[in-house]
Structures are given as structure tokens and as C-alpha cells.
Amino acid sequence: MIEQLDLFPDLVNKKNDTVEIQLSTEEKIKQAVRFIRSLGAMHNIALAFSSGKDSTVLFYIAKEAGIRFTPVHNVTTIDPPFTIRFAEKHGCIIKRPELSFLDLVEKRGFPTQFHRFCCNQLKKKYIADYLLLGIRKDESVKRTKCYSEMDDVYYFSKKIFTNRFFPLLNFNNNDVENCIKEHDLECHPLYYDAEGNFHVERRLGCIGCPLQGDRGKRDFQQHPILLKQVLRRGILYHKRLGRTENDAVLNLVYNLFYSNSNYKNYCQTFQGLFNVNPWTILQKHFQITQNEVLQYLPKPKF
């Protein structure tokens, strides 16, 4: 295993063994380049390229490091527009899943923040023995807690038997924005507004992801056809279990609007304690009617 702290000497306070981030963006880039170069003797190195701003910066740094690596993009089938095209521009190998997201909904139901089986099925697959990822602690409070130690720059995944490395772990949003602007990096089109201004605070992700909260709802407002397709496949799942169309819609509406409250409330949805007509909520927020959804139910695949 690599001695992580020796690769990042400027980040460590030797007196009390605490990690203090006091580097400029360019110094952090140099440290990341040095770290990636230390992996150069290893074989079968890949870079997970999501087409987001972080993987764009990581791709640039890996190129600067001069090592051989293979950029790989996992298609989720509910990616934002232009995502696959942007990955192809970076020479990525495009990996498509055996089952689409809609297939997974029909097979396993709607994903929730408590049960995100779609991530494991569509994203967390074996790619290579050594994998570079653009994960940053700064992205969320949860990740800050999860990757609190410098040793977390390296992690071995037993699920997919892959050594995972996070060269951008201590980059913050300012570092990412500075790197993109200083080195004139082209980012995914959705990071730019109509005037061409770059917005580092924007995030790419699967359309309608339950972890995105209000943004997930806005995604479906912008993509109502996808929401109808998700509903139809979810209805097939619930009907296979002996439930009704209303049960399926109730489940999805709760996942979109209420499941962030607490797990107890989530469990109560199947005990008749949810007193709002879910079709009414769909009509109000997405202008989707019951007839539009039920009229075009596909044939079951499972």
C-alpha cells in the first residue's frame, strides 16, 4: 500500500499529526500530479469520467502526470443531455449497462435515498484494478465525515475488487473553478448559463435522483416524458406484487416529496397513513394526468 502522507508532506502538521489544508490551487494540482505519478508503475489504471467538473479536472491532472490510463464512462441511461457526447470527446470507453434504469424500476421498484440500488447496478462496476475518481470531501457534509483522514485518499473496494484513489479529495469548489479557468478547461455545457458564464456550484447527476431533493423534482419537471416512463415501469413492478396503480404512484410521490423527512414516515406510506391523493400531486407539480400514464402501460419484461 502506498504511504499516503509521504506523498502529501505539505498537508501534514508533524507535531500533532493533523491535516491542515493551506495550499494554493496550483500547489494542490502539483500534489495531485505527484500522487498520480506514483501510480505510474502499476498496470490497468482507469479514470472514472462522469463528464462532471471534478472528473474533467481529474482528467487534466492525470494527463499532466503523464501516466497511462483509460478514461471510462458508465452510462446510467438517465444521464443529463450531452453527457455521453462530452465523455466521447475525452476519448472515454463508453460502458452501457445490461439493464437500463427503467428496467431496474420495473424489476426492483423506485430507488430512494435509503435504497439506492441503481448506483450499484449502473455505476459501481469493476472497471480496472486501479481506479482514479474525482471524489472531493468538499462536496457534502457526509463526504467530509466519510473521508476525514488523509489515508482515505486510498480505498480498496471489496465489492468490485478495485483499488480506488481520490487525488482531488482536498480540493474545494474554488480550487476546481480556479483550475478550470486558469487552464482553460472545457466543461460540460450544463455548467454554463446562456451568456457563457461558468457556474461551479452546479452539479451533474442522474435525472430525478432521490438524493437531490428539490432538484430531483425540477429534473422531472423538465423531463416529464421520463417521469411518465418511470411511473409506468414502477406500476408494472407494484402490480407484479399484487398492488394497485395507486400504490405505485403513492410510492413514487412519497419518494420525491416526503421521504427526506424520516424513515418512520416512509414506512407509513404502505399503512394507509398518507392522506393526499398522489395523482393530484402529479397533476399539480408535473401536469401529468392519470389517463396519460395508464393509457400506455408497456408489456411486462419481468
PLM regions and their residue ranges:
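ATP-dependent adenylation/nucleotidyltransferase module used to activate substrates
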Residues: 1-182
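ATP/NTP-dependent adenylation/nucleotidyl-transfer catalytic domains that generate, transfer
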Residues: 2-6, 12, 192-302
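Glycine-rich nucleotide phosphate-binding loop and flanking beta-alpha elements
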Residues: 138-139, 187, 215
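Extended serine/threonine-enriched, polar tracts that run as long, contiguous segments within proteins
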Residues: 182-189
